Design a protein with these regions (language model features):
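Short, charged, surface-exposed interaction patches
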Residues: 1-193
Length: 193
């Protein structure tokens, strides 16, 4: 008899990546730079206050568009230059990141509107401890497959021998659901004869 055994386990992500983005507009490049730098400093200071270190924080090169040079100048453009700044957190402090997300509204009082709705500004959560749980999951999948095989043997009034062949399926790690992307479901299916 050839059977498949399933093992699933829920784990919490141990790495979080969060691109924090804001936009700034101006008609003067030096003034745009000063306001971008001031807001970046405020965000970094806020992140430090929450408990993140410089090793967790990366400031990317800003993306600056000259709307006049791109032919958008139809006389209705109020600001010539538009900049998008991204400050990224890459951290193992997943719980701290989740708590900080709820406090980001505090930056509004400093005149900073954080863009969190765009696809590129959503936090990403990773689980990198697969090797720690792999042996137990393979064991659970094997036991599950054996239970299925025993049921086959019992229902057909047969006896079950030792494993002739076994293959471990591919491990998959996916979010448990869309509301808690930091909880991961690890899954493996083993095939046994």
């Amino acid at each position: 008899v050839t059977v498949k055994g399933l093992a699933e386990k829920e784990v919490k992500a141990n790495i979080a990546i969060w691109p924090i983005q804001f936009n700034q507009v101006d008609n003067d490049l030096p003034s745009l730079y000063k306001s971008m730098q001031a807001k970046t400093d405020i965000i970094v200071k806020f992140l430090h206050k929450q408990g993140f270190t410089d090793s967790d924080i990366t400031i990317s090169q800003p993306s600056i568009d000259d709307r006049q040079a791109q032919g958008y100048d139809s006389g209705n453009i109020k600001f010539r230059y538009s900049a998008q700044v991204t400050i990224s957190l890459y951290t193992s402090k997943v719980d701290l990141l989740l708590a900080t997300q709820n406090k980001m509204v505090q930056l509004v009082k400093d005149g900073i509107a954080i863009s969190n709705q765009s696809y590129g500004a959503r936090p990403e959560f990773l689980y990198t401890g697969l090797n720690d749980i792999k042996p137990q999951m393979v064991q659970a999948a094997t036991q599950n497959a054996r239970e299925v095989a025993l049921k086959f043997a019992k229902d057909s009034d047969s006896s079950l021998g030792k494993i002739k062949t076994a293959s471990q399926g591919q491990f998959s790690i996916s979010p448990r659901d869309s509301n808690t992307p930091y909880i991961k479901k690890v899954r493996v299916v083993s095939t046994l004869t």
